[in-house]
């Protein structure tokens, strides 16, 4: 399931993030890649233990906390602190898969299962050429290049890549979540059912037996599938 979520950050919030990142120290992005992924990775990142990464990570987590679409799509149990990357001057990240298990920084070794990947764009498409996020699934390849402040959410099990940036610079935040429902097919069904419930409520109101029955069905499925 690949879901685009608009306006996770407002234009003012994007500008604030950009201003903080512009004056920060960037390092070789390969320091956070696995052995295989590092062979195809060429980008810059903000060190995860830096003050700006921690500040802006909390800033983005706060924005996620008020975004109902993200919670409906990801059903997050735990979210790793957001990270920040930059591609420019031919930088790219070849096709790779994310590590299934990731260590939470600053916890002394606590680990989470990476079920859901997210990329939050911090530059508009007209600011750079190339830099498309290409996500592969059973139905083919999907190319994603969204306005600043918009986000794409997709299964962490997907093969994906970032095409070379040939003009300008592509800035983004990226992070992973452990979902309450680890199976992507089950998450997709719950997400689509949630959307259906919202539409039925809009059309019929909340005082109909059909609405209550659908809500009951949603929560019983979540109760059956969730792992806490």
Swiss-Prot record:
Catalytic activity, EC: 1.14.11.-
Cofactor, free-text remark: Binds 1 Fe(2+) ion per subunit.
GO biological process: DNA damage response; intracellular iron ion homeostasis
Single GO molecular function: 2-oxoglutarate-dependent dioxygenase activity
Gene3D superfamilies: q2cbj1_9rhob like domain, Rabenosyn, Rab binding domain
UniProt keyword list: Dioxygenase, Iron, Metal-binding, Oxidoreductase, Vitamin C
Binding positions (Fe cation): 96, 98, 160
Coiled-coil stretches: none
Metal-binding found in the keyword field: yes
Full protein name: PKHD-type hydroxylase Rmet_0838
Organism (species): Cupriavidus metallidurans (strain ATCC 43123 / DSM 2839 / NBRC 102507 / CH34)
Taxonomy of the source species: Bacteria, Pseudomonadati, Pseudomonadota, Betaproteobacteria, Burkholderiales
């Amino acid at each position: 399931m690949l879901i685009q979520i608009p306006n996770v950050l407002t234009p003012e919030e994007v500008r604030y993030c950009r201003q903080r990142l512009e004056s920060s120290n960037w390092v070789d992005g390969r320091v956070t890649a696995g052995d295989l992924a590092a062979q195809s990775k060429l980008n810059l990142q903000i060190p995860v233990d830096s003050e700006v990464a921690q500040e802006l990570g909390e800033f983005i987590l706060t924005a996620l906390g008020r975004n109902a679409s993200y919670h409906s799509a990801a059903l997050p149990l735990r979210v790793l602190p957001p990270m920040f990357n930059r591609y420019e001057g031919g930088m790219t990240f070849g096709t790779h898969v994310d590590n299934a298990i990731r260590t939470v920084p600053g916890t002394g070794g606590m680990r989470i299962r990476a079920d859901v990947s997210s990329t939050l764009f911090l530059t508009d498409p007209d600011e750079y050429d190339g830099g498309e996020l290409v996500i592969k699934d059973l139905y083919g390849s999907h190319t994603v290049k969204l306005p600043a402040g918009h986000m794409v959410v997709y299964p962490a099990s997907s093969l994906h890549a970032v095409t070379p940036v040939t003009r300008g610079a592509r800035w983004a935040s990226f992070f992973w979540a452990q979902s309450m429902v680890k199976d992507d097919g089950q998450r997709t069904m719950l997400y689509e059912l949630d959307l259906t419930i919202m539409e039925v409520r809009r059309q019929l109101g909340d005082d109909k037996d059909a609405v209550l029955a659908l809500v009951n069905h949603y929560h019983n499925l979540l109760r059956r599938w969730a792992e806490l």
